[in-house]
A protein has these predicted regions:
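Short loop segments at secondary-structure junctions
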Residues: 20-22, 63-65, 90-94, 102-105, ...
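Short beta-alpha junctions and helix-cap segments that line functional grooves
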Residues: 29, 56, 72-74, 110-114
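A short, Trp-centered hydrophobic/proline-enriched beta-strand micro-motif
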Residues: 36-44
């Protein structure tokens, strides 16, 4: 469970954020995320759509100096205690990445979602109801979300498989 929480923070948030953010965004968020003072997470999975990012229903609409996000992300590791979230939403139908801070008006997270295993990490829904985020929290370009996502998903998935092998290799059921 702890390995999953660490993986969600270090790879799905920090690594992904680093590669799609600009210098100003890194200066504001990276040091606290690297030190562990802030915990990060990635919001991609949606109720009813899972990881089908092309079917995603979360939207972001530009309104002056802000974007207004509406939608829900589910099964988000570190969603309960996270401070900042790399969230994917559609802008004019194109998948786009945003940084959402827990303090943004209109943002909330659900209670802890109970799980069968991996209890060392929390899981929650991220809820955006007319959530206002600064326009400077756009990560990369509008429509660049799929590129960021695909570039950064394989390393965590490989890491998760290695972590799980390490966990189960101690189980007598998998010994020769």
């Amino acid at each position: 469970g702890f390995a999953l929480a660490y993986l969600a923070h270090s790879m799905l948030f920090v690594n992904n954020f680093y590669h799609c953010s600009n210098a100003e965004q890194r200066a504001k968020y990276l040091a606290k995320s690297l030190s562990g003072e802030w915990i990060g997470a990635m919001g991609m999975t949606e109720p009813g759509y899972g990881t089908d990012v092309l079917g995603m229903t979360t939207t972001a609409v530009r309104d002056g100096d802000e974007y207004i996000l509406n939608g829900t992300k589910t099964y988000i590791t570190n969603g309960v205690e996270g401070h900042c979230f790399l969230v994917y939403a559609k802008v004019d139908g194109r998948v786009t990445a945003f940084l959402v801070d827990r303090t943004c008006p209109g943002f909330s997270s659900s209670h802890h979602i109970d799980k069968l295993g991996m209890r060392g990490s929390t899981m929650a829904e991220l809820i955006f109801e007319e959530c206002k985020i600064p326009k400077n929290n756009l990560l990369g370009e509008i429509g660049g979300g799929l590129t960021h996502m695909m570039r950064n998903l394989p390393p965590p998935l490989i890491g998760a498989r290695i972590d799980m092998y390490g966990v189960v290799s101690g189980d007598p059921a998998v010994k020769d």
